[in-house]
Amino acid sequence: MVARVVWDHEAAGSSPVTSIPENHLETFVSGWSFCIIPHFLPRCIQIRAFAVQLFKYMFFYAAAMLPRCKACAPVYVVLHNLIMEAIPCRVAPAGYFSVVFSPQKRYNNLKFRNIREGIFMGKVRHCLRSAAGYLAVCAKWLVLAALVGCVVGPLGAAFGLALNWANATRAAQPWLLYLLPIAGLVIVFLYSHFDPDGGGSTNQVFVSVREHKPMTLRTAPLIFASTVMTHLFGGSSGREGAALLLGGSVSGQIGKVFHLENRDCRLMTMCGMAGAFSAIFGTPLAATIFTLEVVDVGSMQYAALLPCLVSALLGVFISGRMGLAPESFVLKAEVAATPLNLVRVILLGALLAALSIFFCELLHTAPKLYEKVFPTPYLRVVAGGVLIAALTTLLGTTDYNGAGAAVIEAAIDGEAIPYAFLLKMLFTALTLGAGFKGGEIVPIFFTGATFGCVAAPLLGLPPQLGASLGMVALFCGCTNSPLASICLAIEVFGGQCIALFALACAVSYMLSSYFSLYREQHFLHSKLRIVGVQRVHGRWSETDAKHFTTNDDGEN
């Protein structure tokens, strides 16, 4: 193997060892392109070419990193001597390298500077700028989410404490029930004058999230006052749905104060929903996942995961400090996940799915019947109040007025009246259909717990387990939020029999079809196959997967 050397400056009569020009880097390095080819490599063109290019770029990059000053001349001299010592070897021993020098076009110092700064430092600066921008956005949402949690948390806690006071006061003063029609007139008057377009429905917050339109601030005091009045005078409604409106309206206005874009206001609204739900019920994980998956079923906005979770955690922390205890139960009967028990749970989940369809349709039909019989909202709310007061007097119990938390606890302990779930559905439909305000989720818990307590022994399951499964699975079937339902089971029941809860929720979700508690809830994917769905003539039907697309907002 012969090494060949050709030096431009040797032809000019100068020695590279003893004479280093001022522009030494340009003279010594940039005039020559060299490569080292290991003899032990196989004679494969690709491998040899790769070795050539690798050493070539390594040398030029190392040379370019040296500063341009005369003090570095000895370094170049040493490098030159090392190379020159290798050149006289006409035949390289085994394992040695043959050095081949060939003249190429000159590389000036600007080229080296571009390699050093343009490639390396440029990439570093780009990475640092990208990381700084990314961290700035994360910090922004952490601060905003914390602010929302600190604002919505006390409001949610105050709302929950006010509802507890209202139910306790009504229980101590039964005569308040007969003032329910008058309370209904006040509620209709407030909404007709201060929020004629909103109506105080949970669907309002769904539209706000989907269309990037923050709700008005007056929604918060209206839903607060009207829901407390409904509970105080004996209406049958919940609180979580109202909490979604309360938190969503306040957090949306916070976004407007900071002049956020509509898309950012959407995320702020979701943070408020999670914070208020968590503050009321004490389940931050379920509140976060519920907010992400309930608006558009099949599409979760994971960008809202961290902000919503921060708001939810702060909400439950503040509400606990204010004295509002989180909901939690102890499951007194545990069942092993044997094949027979799994079949029993599947059957119970199917029954709960059918019940969820019936409950949703009942709540949607009641307002239509009221409108057909009573033409004005004032007549409707008075008629509803009279009907509820009459039924309560006829039954001789107030178990079906208000939220019914005591009945839920009794059902989870294994005691429930067989027809209690039917009466609760009737009372809730009469209350909300007439124009009274409140949520639907606690009545769902009541209905599911009492139904499960009655149906479980017929299937061979303990009534305590049946009530717990019914409470969670009916919530899943009505709201179409399976992940939030499983999280709810973990937080409320401490993770006991979680596999059975997950199975019941999955069955209820799949068999409940496209019925929903909320009219503004959209479905993006089929429950049975991996295809999209679209609304045709008011019904959700499957569409061809090839033609199914979603926009940036997750809508079809």
Question: What are these model-predicted stretches?
Answer:
Residues 2-9, 17:
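Extreme N-terminal basic, low-complexity initiation segments
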Residues 54-57, 112:
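Cationic, low-complexity basic patches in intrinsically disordered or flexible, solvent-exposed regions
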Residues 18, 36-40, 53, 100:
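Intrinsically disordered, low-complexity segments enriched in serine/threonine/proline/glycine
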Residues 1, 13, 26, 31-33, ...:
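Short, positively charged low-complexity motifs
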Residues 6, 31-34, 43, 140, ...:
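Residues in intrinsically disordered, low-complexity segments of regulatory proteins
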Residues 8, 23, 38, 42, ...:
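Intrinsically disordered, low-complexity cationic segments
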Residues 95, 103, 107-556:
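Alpha-helical transmembrane segments and immediately membrane-proximal extracytoplasmic
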